[in-house]
Regions:
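Short runs within selected transmembrane alpha-helices of multi-pass transporters and secretion channels
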Residues: 11-14, 23-26, 62-63, 67, ...
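Juxtamembrane boundary at the C-terminal end of a transmembrane helix
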Residues: 192-198
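Short membrane-interface helical motifs at transmembrane helix boundaries
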Residues: 60-79, 198
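Helix-loop junctions and terminal segments of transmembrane helices
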Residues: 10, 14-51, 105-110
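Interfacial/gating helices of multi-pass transporter permease domains
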Residues: 1-15, 80-86
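Membrane-interface helix-boundary motifs at transmembrane edges
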Residues: 40-41, 45, 111-113, 165-176
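Hydrophobic alpha-helical transmembrane segments of multipass membrane transporters and ion channels
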Residues: 52-60, 93, 185-189
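Interfacial transmembrane-helix starts/ends
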Residues: 40-68, 85-88, 180
């Protein structure tokens, strides 16, 4: 259907380029974290450095898509694909956190937490099915359903990220403040620009 086509294009457009970068960083992180698995202090340091590096790489492009996704898709693919751009706007912040958290999940292997990884994956699968079903049944609106799916994705990605922070004794509150502050600093001026353009 058209909805599937729009969603597929929006997801691939914003996730594929960053997944290549994330995969490369993830391989390096896995190698280094494996070498440091018995040195929790060094492992904590490299985990923080990697997560912040990923955030700094991803925040601007994903913020631009969040604010200007409909314009970008209309310009690149034509006006018939504005809907895909609107979907991308709803998905972008989730994909940002997916980009950040994916390389860090190598710690499941490094710290030998495969059972926890399995539990997280089961929760992810069932919660996604539930949110799509609820969105379709109660709201019958694709935009609301995609928004809820994206919010769920952000929550799940952050839950896994903070799970590792807790294991490595990284201050979770400080990192929440760091993320919220920097996302606001980047996105707010872009929204002002959009308002001026309208």
């Amino acid at each position: 259907t058209a909805i599937v086509g729009f969603y597929s294009l929006s997801y691939r457009f914003i996730s594929l380029p960053m997944s290549i970068i994330g995969s490369s960083i993830g391989q390096v992180f896995f190698q280094k974290s494996s070498e440091l698995k018995n040195d929790k202090k060094a492992l904590k340091k490299i985990t923080l450095e990697t997560y912040k590096k990923l955030f700094k790489i991803g925040i601007l492009p994903f913020a631009i898509i969040t604010v200007f996704g409909d314009y970008i898709f209309a310009f690149v693919f034509g006006k018939d694909w504005i809907v895909a751009g609107e979907y991308a706007q709803l998905l972008a912040i989730w994909i940002l956190f997916l980009f950040i958290h994916s390389p860090i999940t190598n710690l499941f292997s490094t710290l030998e937490k495969q059972k926890d990884a399995l539990l997280f994956n089961i929760i992810i699968i069932f919660s996604r099915i539930l949110i799509i079903s609820l969105g379709g049944y109660f709201f019958k609106d694709i935009y609301i359903t995609i928004f809820l799916y994206s919010v769920l994705g952000i929550f799940l990605n952050l839950s896994i990220l903070f799970y590792f922070f807790r294991l490595l004794k990284i201050n979770i509150f400080n990192e929440i403040v760091y993320l919220l502050t920097n996302i606001t600093i980047v996105i707010l001026p872009l929204y002002v620009v959009r308002l001026l353009l309208n």
